[in-house]
Structures are given as C-alpha cells and as structure tokens.
Amino acid sequence: MAVPQNKITKSRRGQRRSHDALVAGNPNECPNCGELKRPHHVCAACGHYADREVIAQADEIDLDEDAA
C-alpha cells in the first residue's frame, strides 16, 4: 500500500494549491436587453445571441385557464 515517504509541510501544500483558485467570470451586457450574460453564450433573459433571436421566449401560461 502506498504511503507518503515524508510529511508534506503546510507551506509545500499551499504552494501546490496556489494554482487551484477559481477565476471569476467576466459577464458582458446583452446588446438586446441589457442584462448580464456569459461571453459567447445565449442571453438567458431574452434568448438572443449576436443580434438575433435563437431561443423563442414562451409566453406566461395562466394555469387557471387551462384547468377548465
């Protein structure tokens, strides 16, 4: 069974982990609606990408009307 030959110091462990930090995203403003969106992704608020509608937004459904 493999075991460590020597103890890894806190300093050495920290140096190894120094590159593991997550990088914060860089959101862009949607040119259509102004909401923040991820770069090179479809806007979640309006469904537009590169000045054209990619995902059609569904209208709100009134549940009371459909139940009758």
UniProtKB/Swiss-Prot annotation:
Superkingdom field: Bacteria
UniProt-listed InterPro entries: Ribosomal_bL32, Ribosomal_bL32_bact, Ribosomal_zn-bd
Location of region: Disordered: 1-25
Gene Ontology annotations for the cellular component aspect, listed alphabetically: large ribosomal subunit
Keyword terms of this UniProt record: Ribonucleoprotein, Ribosomal protein
GO molecular function: structural constituent of ribosome
GO terms under biological process: translation
Family (UniProt): Belongs to the bacterial ribosomal protein bL32 family.
NCBIfam families: rpmF_bact (TIGR01031)
Protein name, per record: Large ribosomal subunit protein bL32
